[in-house]
């Protein structure tokens, strides 16, 4: 959000395909990098949405995949992370344990 939802400025993998989408599309959901063990990879994952649930608190948020990662999970934008870290344990531990499901973005 601090970069006006600019995928090129963020240097994310999906910028090649999604940087020229309307601001309303780019800003509809917080962003995540996706490298989960189940689901599409590479360009096929770009623009897809996930419903992410903090397993410790049940807090949920929908995010849009804009990047890749290599940690075997998700790399949530800090604002998204903070939104579902409702008890502060994720910040204290440096990570959250989450479940995710692919959902319709409603675009």
Swiss-Prot record:
Preferentially expressed in the tissue surrounding the abscission zone of fruitlets. GO terms for molecular function: RNA nuclease activity. Keywords: Cell wall, Disulfide bond, Pathogenesis-related protein, Plant defense, Secreted. PANTHER family: HEVEIN-LIKE PREPROPROTEIN, WOUND-INDUCED PROTEIN WIN2. InterPro entries: Barwin_CS, Barwin_dom, PR4, RlpA-like_sf. This is Pathogenesis-related protein PR-4. GO terms for biological process: defense response; defense response to bacterium; defense response to fungus. Residues 1-107 form the Barwin domain. Induction: Up-regulated in both the abscission zone and surrounding tissues following treatment with propylene and after wounding due to embryoctomy. It is found in: Secreted, Cell wall. Pfam families: Barwin (PF00967). May be involved in protecting plant tissues from pathogen infection. One of its GO terms (cellular component) is extracellular region. Gene3D superfamilies: RlpA-like domain. Disulfide bonds join 14-46, 35-69, 49-105.
